[in-house]
């Protein structure tokens, strides 16, 4: 009953916030606006797909600005590290994607503005919107947080954007996009999959603070790795580094697996990476897009 009441309150606040603060804005005058979103509260693969989009567009000679929310500081840090050698891709953090998009539009320094999330910001009109679907688009109150894992309903997005929406299914056998584990390595570049079968570690633990930790666990188990314990922190946890260091010190004979996003928090706010012990492994993901879908996306962005 409490969760139902919370869902009703959440829905009322959502509609009030959009009616007052997020009324439809003006389209950009010069640059192409792209929004990557999902109905899910987290864990849909938005940042990995943004990474793939930016790589694909920059390979075509396009200049790309990626806009992240300030709250997702770890995702911005991960993207900056990933694109450090590509000056044509710049990462920005902001609390107001709409305002920053228009500021960048006036500079004409980029060809594309790519919003990592922003699906719920109804001011971002005229965008090409890619929606990552892991289930059918939600239509009922019971699918909203905290009863479900949806932030909004399909009808909330039916009329406020004048651009084009492309829905991409991610969770069925016919999916044309896959998010797969590329490697699980420590600082010596040793892959855990090659050593976990031995008596090298007493335990193998998942330690993460991401949107969908259960999907990560399933992906790791599919690699043949038996997980001993699962420690899930909140997404974007700013105390992640301290909590992980404590766990590592208390369990030196155990292996710990974190994600790339978790690793982006390991500087503890100092800007300098902390020492990584040999028993700390980073699970790195890659995005595989079907050739037909990739061609469709490029055609949508470059020729329309």
What is the predicted function of each stretch?
Residues 1-11:
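Charged, amphipathic alpha-helical linker segments immediately N-terminal to NTP-binding catalytic cores
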Residues 139-253:
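C-terminal accessory "lid"/substrate-recognition subdomains
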Residues 61-63, 109-110, 126, 201, ...:
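Short, high-confidence coil segments that cap the C-terminus of an alpha-helix
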Residues 254-261:
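Acidic beta-strand-to-loop metal/phosphate-binding motif
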Residues 233-237, 276-304:
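Short, flexible loop segments at boundaries between secondary-structure elements
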Residues 18-72, 176, 186, 197:
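Walker A (P-loop) phosphate-binding motif
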Residues 60, 81-86, 220-228:
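Short helix-loop-beta junction
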Residues 71-177, 183-187:
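Phosphate/Mg2+-binding loops and adjacent switch elements
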């Amino acid at each position: 009953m409490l969760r139902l009441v919370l869902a009703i309150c959440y829905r009322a606040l959502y509609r009030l916030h959009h009616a007052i603060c997020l009324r439809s804005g003006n389209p950009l005058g010069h640059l192409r606006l792209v929004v990557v979103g999902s109905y899910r509260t987290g864990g849909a693969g938005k940042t990995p797909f943004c990474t793939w989009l930016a790589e694909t567009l920059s390979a075509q000679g396009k200049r790309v600005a990626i806009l992240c929310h300030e709250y997702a500081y770890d995702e911005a840090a991960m993207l900056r590290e990933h694109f450090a050698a590509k000056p044509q891709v710049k990462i920005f953090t902001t609390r107001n994607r709409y305002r920053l998009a228009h500021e960048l539009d006036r500079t004409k320094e980029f060809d594309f503005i790519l919003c990592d999330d922003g699906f719920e910001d109804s001011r971002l009109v005229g965008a090409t919107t890619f929606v990552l679907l892991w289930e059918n688009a939600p239509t009922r109150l019971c699918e909203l947080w905290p009863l479900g894992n949806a932030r909004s309903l399909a009808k909330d997005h039916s009329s406020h954007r004048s651009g084009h929406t492309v829905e991409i299914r991610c969770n069925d056998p016919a999916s044309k996009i896959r998010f797969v584990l590329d490697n699980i390595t420590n600082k010596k570049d040793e892959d855990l999959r090659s050593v976990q079968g031995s008596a090298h570690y007493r335990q193998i633990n998942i330690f993460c603070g991401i949107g969908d930790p259960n999907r990560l666990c399933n992906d790791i188990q599919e690699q043949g790795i038996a997980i001993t314990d699962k420690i899930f922190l909140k997404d974007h946890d700013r105390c992640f580094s301290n909590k992980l260091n404590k766990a590592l010190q208390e369990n030196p004979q155990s292996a710990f697996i974190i994600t790339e996003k978790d690793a982006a928090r390991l500087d503890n706010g100092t800007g300098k990476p902390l020492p990584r012990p040999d028993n700390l492994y980073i699970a790195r993901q890659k995005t595989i897009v079907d050739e037909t879908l990739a061609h469709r996306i490029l055609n949508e962005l470059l020729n329309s």
